[in-house]
Amino acid sequence: MWKRLLIVSAVSAAMSSMALAAPLTVGFSQVGSESGWRAAETNVAKSEAEKRGITLKIADGQQKQENQIKAVRSFVAQGVDAIFIAPVVATGWEPVLKEAKDAEIPVFLLDRSIDVKDKSLYMTTVTADNILEGKLIGDWLVKEVNGKPCNVVELQGTVGASVAIDRKKGFAEAIKNAPNIKIIRSQSGDFTRSKGKEVMESFIKAENNGKNICMVYAHNDDMVIGAIQAIKEAGLKPGKDILTGSIDGVPDIYKAMMDGEANASVELTPNMAGPAFDALEKYKKDGTMPEKLTLTKSTLYLPDTAKEELEKKKNMGY
């Protein structure tokens, strides 16, 4: 009798161990592929999943929330082990996240946060301190102009995106005690190069062919790279006639720095999935709940280290 019980217990333990060791499947609702940084984030997520033996299913939202919601519902229907979301905007997520919660599928937010009353609808948000990122650019500008008058034009990210809201806020906080620095125009460039160029062209036209503009602050590098092209086409020198400051740290911004056409960028790591996978595996193993906010590092880079930083970006999928 005892021998039989021991055998049954051993089999049960083995089956439990096998269940824990079973490969995980994660659905990832990605915003889109609007920038070099976003492409790198997707590439790094694939790499992080592969080295853990996790099956990663990626759905490109094409910068539309309705597409992302459909993808999340599809992942719920498929019965995935977890869902990662890089939310295009901060609001409107409650209904679909409740569906995931009812299905007992944990949700992890990457890069961007959401605005929900019920914080139990997601496990954690893996993101940078986007307010700090905006502030780092603002602090740099205050020192750079050293009290001289400086009119700034701002290329905002996607309207309603948490990163756009926070990066705007951080920059504004940094310059609030610098009366010599004023934001004279601000408009969304939707985080894309083409839109960044288009909006910058309108800013230049409205401001005496750019002569009234001291600096362009963009919520990501891709928009400022588009703006650099617009500045050049207007017969001005980017990085000199009009200073630039942006966020992401993509390879092309370091190339622009090396060419003397860009001044400052705050690097945002594309590895948002790694910490999320770590948290998921701990949760699946023993129920460990992660902190609600997992912050990644943000660092200001200037032209003097551009070549070195560019080398680090090789083979990252930008």
From Swiss-Prot:
UniProt signal peptide: 1-21
Task: Could you list this entry's UniProt keywords, alphabetically sorted.
Answer: Disulfide bond, Periplasm, Signal, Sugar transport, Transport
Give one Pfam family: Peripla_BP_4
Disulfide pairings: 150-214
Looking up InterPro entries in the UniProt record yields:
Peripla_BP_I, SBP_2_dom, YtfQ_transport
Function as written in the Swiss-Prot or TrEMBL entry: Part of the ABC transporter complex YtfQRT-YjfF involved in galactofuranose transport. Binds to both alpha- and beta-galactofuranose.
The entry describes its oligomerization and partners as: The complex is composed of two ATP-binding proteins (YtfR), two transmembrane proteins (YtfT and YjfF) and a solute-binding protein (YtfQ).
Which PANTHER family does the UniProt entry name for this protein?
D-ALLOSE-BINDING PERIPLASMIC PROTEIN-RELATED (PTHR46847), GALACTOFURANOSE-BINDING PROTEIN YTFQ (PTHR46847:SF3)
User: What is the recorded name of this protein?
Assistant: Galactofuranose-binding protein YtfQ
Q: Which organism is this protein's natural source?
A: Escherichia coli (strain K12)
